[in-house]
């Protein structure tokens, strides 16, 4: 007999936790749509030559390739005959949603309206080394606004407002969207004489490690043999990336102080101007100033970011790290089209976030059942009646399960409690004679009678009240 087991790097949930995960997906989707983003899905696998156009290096070593049994048999037969390998398999599983988006926009460019606002919430696959908290299959929840030839900086502010709306409704604790601009970093490095493009990118990658590795690690790296930057310059870099703002007015003051102390080179001036505009628009969008700040150490390790960059963290759980990140890029699909397609977007790695929240004990409170009521069956002769009650409840919008076999009432209550079902509906001879049903509320530990015709509406009111209390509790926090 084969031992049942899942591959390493997979998060498989039991129903109660799956419901909590699904509700987080629903919140994210609802807010994406509220801001006018349109849904897109792309195939789980792409043509290898399309998917791997601009990857190489570490990414290509993590890609899962796809082959049919027929293709494997043909390859084996060719090898037996001494033929050379045909190279990589034709198909590969996507490792993020950005490259498929680039292909999608380039392929459908003349059918889309620009700026194109898309959201995508699908699984991606990477051959990560198996370790706790790292996943080989995981959900990414992305939004992007793609322009044709140009895209206003105003969209960068709107994306920050989307981040705020999502995490405010998720209700998983206080959070902070940390904001920076790659032009700010590049302009500052230029003022120190670190102007060469590849060197700047390498320094940016090291700066992006400060929160994880610490300032001393970055200092040693930048002054070491690989970089050889003078200690005095590195000290200025570390002082610069230590800047954090506290409130809207302070953020603007920090930008003004930077401009006065360094002098506005063309690149630095652009970065400062863009951040100022984003900050003013974020205020107009109603994002509270406690929800965002400037953080000059935020660089984002990916080379294609060129302007605004975001990192979002939970205030009370910094060990979780970034829960949402993204930024501005100048040309999404340069490998697939000659058109210039600038954009701005973010990604929420929901699988890792959910796992981290569960580890921190922050999931239990929302892990309810999606079944609202269960109709108990105490006697075989009452089956038709129980099915009719369930039918009426479902018509009334109440998710309902029926016990199909008669059991002792205590066992049926026990089952409902373990399954997280709030209401148990009972209809015995006494209730039938009085034209009512009995309802046991397992949350409040109360039992009451309800007229049959009013059962669905009564339970709907109870559920709405519970939902309102949950929402007010989240708002209070």
UniProtKB/Swiss-Prot annotation:
GO terms for biological process: histidyl-tRNA aminoacylation. One of its GO terms (molecular function) is histidine-tRNA ligase activity. Pfam families: HGTP_anticodon, tRNA-synt_His. It is an enzyme of class 6 (ligase). CDD domains: HisRS-like_core (cd00773), HisRS_anticodon (cd00859). It catalyses: tRNA(His) + L-histidine + ATP = L-histidyl-tRNA(His) + AMP + diphosphate + H(+). HAMAP family: His_tRNA_synth (MF_00127). This is Histidine--tRNA ligase. It comes from Xanthomonas campestris pv. campestris (strain 8004). The gene is hisS.
